[in-house]
C-alpha cells in the first residue's frame, strides 16, 4: 500500500522543501545527500554531494535545469564510499540510469535512498545563462505544475520526447504534476518507507484522495502530450541522417577521437569493453538501456540530434523484437 502525505509549501515553497530535505537527512540517517545545489553566486545549479543538513540551504530540486545526469556522481560517490548511505534527489531519467547501474552491478541500491521528483522538463545551460539565475526557472516550474508545465517545445528535445516523467524505483516521490505546487505538494512512499523515514512527522498530514487522483490525471495528460511531441520530433528526422544500429555504431567509431557524447553518458561504460572498438551488440544493449536524459545530444560538438536518433533506433529495435515474438495461441 502506498502512503501519501501533503506538504504545505507556503509562504516560501523552496525554503519549505529544503526544510523537508533537512529533516529527511536526519530521520533517514544519511551520510550524504546528492541534490541539485545552487552556486555561491546564484548563477548556476548542478548536482552536488552535501554531508551535512546545513548545506541544503542552497538546494533547489525544482529548478528545471540539467547540466549532467546525476547518476554519474552517485556512482562516483559509492565507489569511493561503499559503506556509506547516500540519499539522492533525482529526476526520472536519472533514476532510470541509476537503476541500470544497479542492474549492471555497478551500484548497490541497498546503500541508496532515492527521492524522485516529478519532472516537467529541463533547460540546458544556454537558457540558464539567459535568465541569469535558476531561481526564476524554479518559481516558474512550480507556478505551472498544476497544468503539467509550460509548452514542451521550450525544453530540451530529450525532455520533449520523454513519455515517462514520473520517478520510478524511488523510496520517496515528490509529486508536483496537477497540484498547486506553490501551496501544497504530495510526498508519496510505501507504508514501510513512511514509517522508516518518519514522513508523518516531516509533513503536514495525509494527502486527500482528490490530490492523489488529480496528480494521476495530469500525469496521463502530460504523457499523451509528450507522445505527440515525440512523434513530431522523430518524423522531422526523416531523410536527415541514416538511423539504424549500424549507422549509429559507425558514427561512434568516427567519433573515437572526441567521444564527448559518450563520456557524459552515465551508463555507456557499463556496456562497452573497449571504447576504441564498440561492437554492434554492445551498441544495441546500450541503446535499449538508454535512460533518455539527452546529455549526449547536449554535449555533441557536431550538434547532431543524438537523443532523437537513439530514440528512433530504440523504437526500431523494439518493433523488430516484437515481430519475432510468437503470436499467442
Question: Where do the model's predicted regions map?
Answer:
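Iron-sulfur-associated redox domains of electron-transfer enzymes in respiratory
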Residues: 1-240
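Generic structural signal for well-ordered, non-membrane alpha-helical segments
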Residues: 10-17, 258, 293, 306
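Alpha-helix boundary/capping residues
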Residues: 102-105, 255, 316
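Cysteine-cluster motifs in flexible loop/terminal segments that predominantly coordinate metals
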Residues: 149-173, 255-261, 268, 273, ...
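Ferredoxin-type iron-sulfur electron-transfer modules in oxidoreductases and energy-metabolism complexes
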Residues: 229-253, 260-329
Amino acid at each position: 500500500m502506498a502512503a501519501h502525505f501533503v506538504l504545505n509549501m507556503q509562504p516560501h515553497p523552496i525554503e519549505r522543501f529544503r526544510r523537508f530535505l533537512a529533516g529527511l537527512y536526519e530521520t533517514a540517517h544519511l551520510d550524504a545527500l546528492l541534490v541539485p545545489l545552487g552556486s555561491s553566486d546564484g548563477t548556476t545549479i548542478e548536482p552536488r554531494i552535501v554531508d551535512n543538513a546545513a548545506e541544503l540551504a542552497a538546494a533547489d530540486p525544482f529548478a528545471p535545469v540539467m547540466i549532467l545526469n546525476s547518476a554519474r556522481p552517485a556512482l562516483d560517490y559509492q565507489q569511493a564510499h561503499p559503506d556509506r548511505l547516500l540519499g539522492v534527489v533525482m529526476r526520472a531519467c536519472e533514476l532510470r540510469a541509476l537503476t541500470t547501474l544497479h542492474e549492471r552491478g555497478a551500484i548497490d541500491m541497498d546503500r541508496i535512498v532515492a527521492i524522485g521528483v516529478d519532472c516537467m522538463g529541463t533547460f540546458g545551460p544556454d537558457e540558464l545563462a539567459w535568465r541569469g539565475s535558476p531561481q526564476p526557472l524554479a518559481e516558474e516550474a512550480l507556478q505551472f505544475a498544476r497544468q503539467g508545465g509550460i509548452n514542451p517545445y521550450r525544453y530540451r528535445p530529450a525532455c520533449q520526447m520523454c513519455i515517462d516523467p514520473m520517478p520510478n524505483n524511488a523510496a520517496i516521490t515528490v509529486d508536483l504534476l496537477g497540484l498547486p505546487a506553490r501551496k501544497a505538494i504530495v510526498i508519496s512512499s510505501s507504508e514501510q518507507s513512511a514509517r522508516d523515514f518518519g514522513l508523518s512527522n516531516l509533513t503536514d498530514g495525509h494527502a486527500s484522495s482528490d490530490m492523489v487522483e488529480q496528480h494521476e490525471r495530469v500525469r496521463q495528460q502530460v504523457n499523451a502530450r509528450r507522445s505527440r511531441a515525440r512523434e513530431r520530433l522523430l518524423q522531422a528526422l526523416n531523410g536527415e541522417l541514416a538511423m539504424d544500429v549500424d549507422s549509429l555504431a559507425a558514427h561512434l567509431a568516427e567519433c573515437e577521437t572526441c567521444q564527448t557524447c559518450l563520456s557524459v553518458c552515465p551508463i555507456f561504460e557499463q556496456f562497452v569493453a573497449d571504447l576504441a572498438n564498440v561492437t554492434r551488440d554492445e551498441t544495441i544493449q546500450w541503446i535499449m538501456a538508454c535512460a533518455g536524459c539527452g546529455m549526449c545530444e547536449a554535449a555533441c560538438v557536431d550538434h547532431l540530434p543524438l537523443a532523437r536518433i537513439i530514440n528512433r533506433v530504440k523504437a526500431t529495435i523494439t518493433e523488430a523484437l516484437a515481430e519475432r515474438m510468437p503470436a499467442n495461441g
